[in-house]
UniProtKB/Swiss-Prot annotation:
Belongs to the complex I subunit 1 family. NDH-1 is composed of 13 different subunits. Subunits NuoA, H, J, K, L, M, N constitute the membrane sector of the complex. The chain crosses the membrane at residues 11-31, 81-101, 114-134, 154-174, 187-207, 238-258, 270-290, 309-329. It is an enzyme of class 7 (translocase). It is a multi-pass membrane protein. It catalyses: a quinone + NADH + 5 H(+)(in) = a quinol + NAD(+) + 4 H(+)(out). This is NADH-quinone oxidoreductase subunit H. It is found in: Cell inner membrane. GO terms for biological process: aerobic respiration. One of its GO terms (molecular function) is quinone binding. GO terms for cellular component: plasma membrane. Keywords: Cell inner membrane, Cell membrane, Membrane, NAD, Quinone, Translocase, Transmembrane, Transmembrane helix, Ubiquinone. It comes from Pseudomonas fluorescens (strain SBW25).
Amino acid sequence: MTWFTPEVIDVIISVVKAIVILLAVVVAGALLSFVERRLLGWWQDRYGPNRVGPFGMFQIAADMLKMFFKEDWTPPFADKVIFTLAPVVAMSALLIAFAVIPITPTWGVADLNIGLLFFFAMAGLSVYAVLFAGWSSNNKFALLGSLRASAQTVSYEVFMGLALMGIVVQVGSFNMRDIVEYQAQNLWFIIPQFFGFCTFFIAGVAVTHRHPFDQPEAEQELADGYHIEYAGMKWGMFFVGEYIGIILISALLVTLFFGGWHGPFGILPQLAFFWFFLKTAFFIMLFILLRASIPRPRYDQVMDFSWRFCLPLTLINLLVTAAVVLLNTPAAAVQ
């Protein structure tokens, strides 16, 4: 009797895939800080980091060494357990959310029938990390930043979910692979669900607290917001977690609206990973371009925009999609 039964081999392969994907995401999140600075320098007609190594390519290694050797200080007035737990929860929730994203037909961690719901569960868990960080720091600026962040995240997650309901109505499934395969046989959802895409993208920027929705970390108002008391690797986990969030939202946009691993018009299906990577990289660059080109609005304007613009748009999109699907459904199937 051998231990390496087909079931055991499948488990080992799944674990190896999970480790490879999660390590790749963490490394990519760290590298994005360098990529962002280089792109911002290019767009703003300056050099950016260009001193460490050829073309500044070793700058990220220098930053990581600096962060690693910094004092991992915990304020004496902080709740030490929750203060330490917050960055772990923040980064873990984002990494676990990657489990349901299919990168290629064969590469993915978990093929869940409730993939979309699982993503929203993990996204909601990240709110607790922000609240933990702000409250446990025992700092008024950190607390105000965490309250801003949690209110903003919860508000925009509502529209993020409603924006995807049009896709669920058309496909009839919460499974990510089903959504990708549906787009392979029909139009990519960027066309029939354009308004849902717009709302999801806006909500994605807001949920990741990226510019122009970075009010929870506004330096001029809150002195860096909910992670003001963090230093060393704890701060580094929040820092890298922000870039992992960008990768996550970009990968979701590709999966849900741009055909996932499929190329345009089914071109070169054997290059599945290339198409997924190329489309994800485009949206990552778009996130960075927003930081370089759009001013930061006031917090009340951000919240007003969410409830007065995003909510009606998502509801109209959902109602129109439901009506179109109902009209195209045979009467016998409806009964």
